[in-house]
Amino acid sequence: MAGTFTLRVVSPEGNVLKEEAEFVVLPGGNGEIGILPNHAPLISSIEIGVIRYTVNGKVEKIATSGGFVEVSDNKVTILADTAEPGERVDLDRALAAKERAEKRLTQREGIDVRRAELALMRAVARINAARN
């Protein structure tokens, strides 16, 4: 696993990350997408989940609510709907959001079920990004 590639994560709020990474794993629609240096060109959507990447042998995490990834010329650019590095996640707030979404899903009456499911998925992604 010699070498690195440039990893950029951009969200509507601005640049979230620019690092020389050794490996990145993205939440894809049909499972995880793993990218190493010199990966073949690729454009794909990503789903709600956790982006895991390795820099200098250390694994870091970013919670995302989806977006797109482009791989080209040893550069990986992630255009994320939202992107929150794990160390910035307010874990108590994420746990409370998870609890609210679970409560809504048990009631089911008078709620938008899909919206509650997505809120639960986002909360779980934030929790997973914050935890080691």
From Swiss-Prot:
InterPro entries: ATP_F1_dsu/esu_C_sf, ATP_synth_F1_dsu/esu, ATP_synth_F1_dsu/esu_N, ATP_synth_F1_esu_C, ATPsynth_dsu/esu_N. Keywords: ATP synthesis, Cell membrane, CF(1), Hydrogen ion transport, Ion transport, Membrane, Transport. One of its GO terms (cellular component) is plasma membrane. It is a peripheral membrane protein. It is found in: Cell membrane. Its main location: membrane. GO terms for molecular function: ATP binding; proton-transporting ATP synthase activity, rotational mechanism. HAMAP family: ATP_synth_epsil_bac. F-type ATPases have 2 components, CF(1) - the catalytic core - and CF(0) - the membrane proton channel. CF(1) has five subunits: alpha(3), beta(3), gamma(1), delta(1), epsilon(1). CF(0) has three main subunits: a, b and c. Produces ATP from ADP in the presence of a proton gradient across the membrane. Belongs to the ATPase epsilon chain family. This is ATP synthase epsilon chain. It comes from Desulfitobacterium hafniense (strain DSM 10664 / DCB-2).
